[in-house]
Amino acid sequence: MMQRCLRLQKPLALRRGLHLAQVNSQAVATEAPEAEPLDAFERQYLKERIEISPFQRLFLGTGSSIAALLNPRRHDMIACLGETTGEDALWTILDTMQASEEGQRIMADKPRIHTSTIDFKYLETLPPDTFGAAYVKFLKDNQVTPDSRMAVRFLEDPKLAYLMTRYRECHDLIHTVLDMPTNMLGEVAVKWVEALNTGLPMCYGGAVFGAVRLRPKQRRAYLKHYLPWALENGKRAKPLMPVYWEKRWEQNIHELRSELGITVLNKA
């Protein structure tokens, strides 16, 4: 509790330093008074993370941004960009998680979204108007899998690493609740909602530069319908990171959208 109060009250740089000092102390097995014990995810992440200097972080951030701009299909570069530019936004997201009972449960449980952790056979038995059924339909219609997300490697703090992991693994769930496909137009619209909802710089970059690559017909639809809808939902929706999606499978998807302040776009 004391650590949580410190993080909420101290400036960003100071609270980050306090937490990283605790993490590093535990990583070398030295005594760290008042430090929270590391859980399984955090211990494993500290073994696998790649430590980089501030210069290397700047170099990777710049290089990955250029590579992602030239080729938006370079998911490895997009992932690198997210990790090297998103730390401040992730600290803010962590505060949002800790301010919500549902978010606190997520941070305690650290659930993962994979075919090995989600009972998709069960989701297929749910009524079609439930969130779980809509998620399965989204995966099938767009021919995507939850197992395709890249592992986080460059963030120092394991809690922030989990939040970035959570963001990546929940991306398709955001598509589902927004009723957006995975084509370029749908991805750009979702990125705007995610950018305004999370503050992650990579989401803003994906939204702005992704729109540049739209074809003329797509761009007209984007400017007339998709962009206004995305901006409205991004500003109005409740924080999406603290939503424990795995506990919402049986919930009526229309009720879920209403609870979160989300409206779907009429694509007709």
From Swiss-Prot:
EC number: 4.1.1.130
Residue sites binding Zn(2+) per the record: H171, D172, H175, E187
Cofactor: Zn(2+)
The protein's enzyme class: lyase
A GO BP entry: ubiquinone biosynthetic process
Assembly and oligomerization: Component of a multi-subunit COQ enzyme complex.
PANTHER family: UBIQUINONE BIOSYNTHESIS PROTEIN, UBIQUINONE BIOSYNTHESIS PROTEIN COQ4 HOMOLOG, MITOCHONDRIAL
Residue intervals passing through the bilayer: none
Organism: Drosophila simulans (Fruit fly)
Function: Lyase that catalyzes the C1-decarboxylation of 4-hydroxy-3-methoxy-5-(all-trans-polyprenyl)benzoic acid into 2-methoxy-6-(all-trans-polyprenyl)phenol during ubiquinone biosynthesis.
Transit peptide: 1-25
The UniProt record lists the keyword Membrane: yes
Domain of life: Eukaryota
Catalytic activity as recorded in UniProt: a 4-hydroxy-3-methoxy-5-(all-trans-polyprenyl)benzoate + H(+) = a 2-methoxy-6-(all-trans-polyprenyl)phenol + CO2
Main location: mitochondrion
Subcellular location: Mitochondrion inner membrane
Entry keyword Membrane: yes
Name of the featured protein: Ubiquinone biosynthesis protein COQ4 homolog, mitochondrial
Keywords, ordered alphabetically: Lyase, Membrane, Metal-binding, Mitochondrion, Mitochondrion inner membrane, Transit peptide, Ubiquinone biosynthesis, Zinc
Pathway membership: Cofactor biosynthesis; ubiquinone biosynthesis
GO cellular component, one term: extrinsic component of mitochondrial inner membrane
Family listed: Belongs to the COQ4 family.
Membrane topology: Peripheral membrane protein
